[in-house]
Amino acid sequence: FGGFNRIDFNEDGYKVSPVIISPERKSMLNYNLVMFFTGFTRFSSDIQKANNAGESNENKIKKLKEMYSLVDEAEKILVEKNSDLDEFGRLLDYTWKLKRTTGEKVSTESIDALYKKGIEAGALGGKLLGAGGGGFLIFYVKPENKQNLINAMSGLLHVPFEFENGGSRIIQYTAEDYEG
């Protein structure tokens, strides 16, 4: 889809609505987000199966509804020019801690240690991207603490990125030989 979008899911499918952020705020948010590859890989289907076991559905639904209720708050922080963008980082921290309670495989001791290290280095919040168990860890950090965070996470691959308005596209294609 490209750009910033809010995706609302319902029983009929989903609805994609653009979130309009000023270029200045978007640039600031991009600068304040720092992403790292954890080096841990996993199959998201395995994580989902493990997370579906255990806790009662009623309890999980309650937590997921709380997470969903925070979407409006996050959107408001991003859109309103007078809101403190650092609140987005704090909200990431809160929602990550909430997400961790939704399944035993969302996080691991190693990921928890990396997250703690990031917070101790000055990040206001962060989250693991995807189903959990590994992959990419993203942090929100104030500019004055950005290099501290990068230094603290020096054992991980720092992955610089920029927000994209155009959506998914192929940027490199290498033809392969297929026997058919």
Model-based region annotation:
Residues 1-126, 138-180:
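C-terminal nucleotide
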